Amino acid sequence: FYLHSFAKEQPDLNWENETVREKIYEMICWWMDQGLSGFRIDAIMNIKKDLTWSDLKPDGPDGLADVYKITGKVEGIGDFLMEMKHRCFEPYEALTVGEAMFVKEDILPRFIGEDGYFSTIFAFEPCHAYRKGKNYMNYDWPQPFDEWREETFHNQEIVAKAGFEANIIENHDQPRGASLFIPEEDYGFYSLSALATIIFCERGLPFLYQGQEIGMSN
């Protein structure tokens, strides 16, 4: 079979195959040997699949079903992540930042705890508090800032029990924070500076998306 979660030119790798995993680990370690300090690990929750191949009800205009129906709630991904950590990251004391969305509070220590899979993961919960519908890229703007603020405070309290997260306001999948939170008539140096101050004053590791450092809008 041929499976692609993203572009059709970008096949998913079969992590159930030990030989495939070994090749992945070889490549990671090769880059670490070149002097890299760590990795941002993209879409990592997609590596484990439901391979029962049950028929899925189409949920899109193209007659296909969302791929997350076979990747969203699959047990056993932790075995792969811990193996990769022990084989590739621990020996180099590497910094690892996982793109792991919708990690529930009860399993958060497995991801960022003292013996977690990663050094940290991105703090997506506040960013998804204001999304519209099931599509994580579907937003209305400008958004009431207090909703994001309250969700951020709540998330900070939860995360502090387990470790720390990589804090973001925007990325390549989401609107610019300046456009999302700041009404057009209030757009300027002081409002943009206030938005930037927040991410640097949160507990955790601040991440800036390209253009955010100059207050870029959509």
Regions found by a protein language model. Name each.
Residues 1-218:
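Active-site and adjacent substrate-binding regions of carbohydrate-active enzymes
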